[in-house]
Amino acid sequence: MEVLGLLKFEVSGTIVTVTLLVALLALLKWYSMSAFSRLEKLGIRHPKPSPFVGNLMFFRQGFWESQLELRERYGPLCGYYLGRRMHVVISEPDMIKQVLVENFSNFSNRMASGLEPKMVADSVLLLRDRRWEEVRGALMSSFSPEKLDEMTPLISQACELLVAHLKRYAASRDAFNIQRCYCCYTIDVVASVAFGTQVDSQNSPEDPFVQHCRRASTFCIPRPLLVLILSFPSIMVPLARILPNKNRDELNGFFNTLIRNVIALRDQQAAEERRRDFLQMVLDAQHSMNSVGVEGFDMVPESLSSSECTKEPPQRCHPTSTSKPFTVDEIVGQAFLFLIAGHEVITNTLSFITYLLATHPDCQERLLKEVDLFMGKHPAPEYHSLQEGLPYLDMVISETLRMYPPAFRFTREAAQDCEVLGQRIPAGTVLEIAVGALHHDPEHWPNPETFDPERFTAEARLQRRPFTYLPFGAGPRSCLGVRLGLLVVKLTILQVLHKFRFEASPETQVPLQLESKSALGPKNGVYIKIVSR
């Protein structure tokens, strides 16, 4: 009897264990797919998701190719799941206009994963709601034409170092990866303009600032951890934020200490002794802390060329005092954002321009004539002179940004339930603006894979459908630093082409292979020859 009782107990225990295991597996299976019915309920086409990770494998080749494939297979309104999070992708101009401009109050915030480094979370890129409005409004004065004119000599100094380095390659006549040179150059620009220090990253790669900049640009989440985060976000995101991360903590500590030391030094200096760099402009904005409301923001007009994006905006309202000055963390955040944009976006844009000019010698020849004429009149270019005398350079930059938009996708979050051109959008939905797909849509851009600066003549711009060209976004949350970024690009190409011409070589990759992790860039560099003029 005792043996029978023991057997019954063991059998009962086994049944309970098996039942619990089956229930757990059933629950896990339900969880793995439970988030993946929302797009279908909204009537939005999308790729079939996989358990837990959604459409993560769809993007294994990078977001650029996958975005173009999404548009081709599912149309200008489609969607996907990244982990359990639903993304609605739009590349239809009228829908984009409603989201970015007409219904901006409901789409004023960008998506945040919760895993961004603190320096990024404290930047104007990811600040939210009222605090974003206050900080952006105060920062607008830092990008006025007068302030940019003060920063132009700092960019020119870094450009002189770049030209000196390029002379060595011109003398050798060997093909080389010019993207590496631009990478070093943009670190020099960022150090000087954003962090108030001077470096020569080409000759001093061991400099702590240079090393930390490169570490920041290669910072990423390991793939196994990313899969876990996407599969179980409510558990893994808070856990990942509190777990120790040596690389993240060292980067935060280095840039925080650097900025705090510079601020302390500036506080001891007289006003006329302080460097007129971006950091000083932010500090000046902090002390005055005047802001404008969102209705008066300096908005990048959609569909315009690079030249029009650099013109002084009209003043639409008077500034008012904000209630809360910048914190030191927010100051660090703005400088770090400049680092991200400079090291990636400017480097890649310069690389793409160089590649296109090297492989289109007729366009380069026309641009060289314009450069020589301009430099004959303006041997020491200033911000204002750069805005009027280089129309073909503006066209070349604009067409490059159409073909290779560095920020080829950006997001907005829906604050409340709404409709966009009849499409229901629930609160919390992430809307993704597919700039890459928009810029390569043959309906708006005939022969989109062809480099043709003539698309950006004054006449062509007037005939273009609005909201089909968005390299800097549009509306109140468009790119705040567009004028500074374009200043760096224009001044660099101007100074380099004044001394050299670009030539394609057998090592030049045609067509150029691309990679698209956070921004769009050349996958294997840009190999060319450079010839002294």
Curated annotation (Swiss-Prot):
Residues 32-75, 245-335 are lumenal. The keyword Lipid biosynthesis applies. One of its GO terms (biological process) is positive regulation of vasoconstriction. The chain crosses the membrane at residues 11-31, 76-96, 224-244, 336-356. One of its GO terms (molecular function) is hydroperoxy icosatetraenoate dehydratase activity. PROSITE patterns: CYTOCHROME_P450 (PS00086). Coiled coil: none annotated. This is Thromboxane-A synthase.
